[in-house]
């Protein structure tokens, strides 16, 4: 599990793209020339940006070679760069930085967010969506299984919080629009939940385990999911998935 799996990630493409669509709808820009899609993955969010601004120069950034290869194949009219978001520098100031479900993987948001704002043109926009599910059963149970089986904590940090992000971006010279939405995804089984998180949040927990250790982890995780996510009357499972949205426009 050394690299991301584009096929597994795109298995829930509609559910993963919906927050990107809703974030993009709130971006208050009509015409843009330079756009960066940070953590572009296989290009599903980049495609939305290209549809809205077909004449713009859009650059997708991702640290995964597999994801970059998939994105380049899908969107030959866009530019893609394999790089760490924290170290990448654009060739010119940007009109829009779009980051859909990527920045939650990076530490030090008190430094990262002002840095990203500094890459914007005056009146440029930083648009961010981050999963806010650190306290949801899907992620709490990952930590509990790891503790039970004596594995180190490899999960990502919790988000800083609404008030913290508002202050960070206001102090960086931005007008800030911030909101939180909880999606309820209909899942056909508890295994489907595992398939979902295996492509993202569960990756760091499994990546250094042997095949047999992974199986033990997933078996126990599956048992605990059944306790936390009851079946609906029609046999479906509702997976609550909170997400934090931020649209910050540079005014200084």
From Swiss-Prot:
**Classification via PANTHER family:** TRANS-ACONITATE 2-METHYLTRANSFERASE (PTHR43861:SF1), TRANS-ACONITATE 2-METHYLTRANSFERASE-RELATED (PTHR43861)
Q: What is this protein called?
A: Trans-aconitate 2-methyltransferase
What job does the chain carry out?
Answer: Catalyzes the S-adenosylmethionine monomethyl esterification of trans-aconitate at high affinity and of cis-aconitate, isocitrate, and citrate at lower velocities and affinities.
Q: Where in the cell is it found?
A: Cytoplasm
The record's EC number reads 2.1.1.144
Domain of life from the UniProt record: Bacteria
Q: How does it assemble?
A: Monomer.
| Reactions the enzyme catalyzes | trans-aconitate + S-adenosyl-L-methionine = (E)-3-(methoxycarbonyl)pent-2-enedioate + S-adenosyl-L-homocysteine
User: What is the protein's species of origin?
Assistant: Escherichia coli O157:H7
Q: What is the lineage of its organism?
A: Bacteria, Pseudomonadati, Pseudomonadota, Gammaproteobacteria, Enterobacterales
HAMAP family attached to this UniProt entry = Tran_acon_Me_trans
Q: What class of enzyme is it?
A: transferase
Subcellular location, principal:
cytoplasm
Question: Does the keyword GTP-binding feature in the UniProt annotation?
Answer: no
């Amino acid at each position: 599990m050394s690299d991301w799996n584009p096929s597994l990630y795109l298995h829930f493409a509609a559910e993963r793209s919906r927050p990107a669509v809703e974030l993009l709808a709130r971006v208050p820009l009509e015409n843009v020339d330079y756009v960066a899609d940070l953590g572009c993955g296989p290009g599903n969010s980049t495609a939305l940006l290209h549809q809205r601004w077909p004449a713009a120069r859009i650059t997708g950034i991702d640290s995964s070679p597999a994801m970059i290869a998939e994105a380049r194949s899908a969107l030959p009219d866009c530019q893609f760069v394999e790089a760490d978001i924290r170290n990448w520098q654009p060739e010119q100031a940007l009109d829009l930085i779009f980051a859909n479900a990527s920045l939650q993987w990076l530490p030090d948001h008190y430094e990262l967010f002002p840095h990203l704002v500094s890459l914007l043109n005056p009146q440029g926009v930083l648009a961010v969506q981050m999963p806010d599910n650190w306290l949801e059963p899907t992620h709490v149970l990952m930590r509990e299984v790891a503790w039970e089986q004596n594995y180190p904590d490899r999960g990502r940090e919790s988000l800083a919080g609404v008030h913290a992000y508002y202050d960070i971006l206001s102090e960086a010279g931005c007008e800030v629009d911030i909101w939180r939405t909880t999606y309820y995804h209909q899942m056909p089984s508890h295994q489907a939940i595992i398939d979902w998180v295996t492509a993202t949040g569960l990756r760091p927990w499994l990546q250094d385990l042997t095949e047999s250790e992974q199986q033990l982890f997933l078996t126990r995780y599956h048992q605990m999911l059944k306790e936390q996510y009851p079946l609906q009357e029609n046999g479906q499972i509702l997976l609550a998935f909170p997400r934090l949205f931020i649209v910050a426009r540079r005014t200084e």
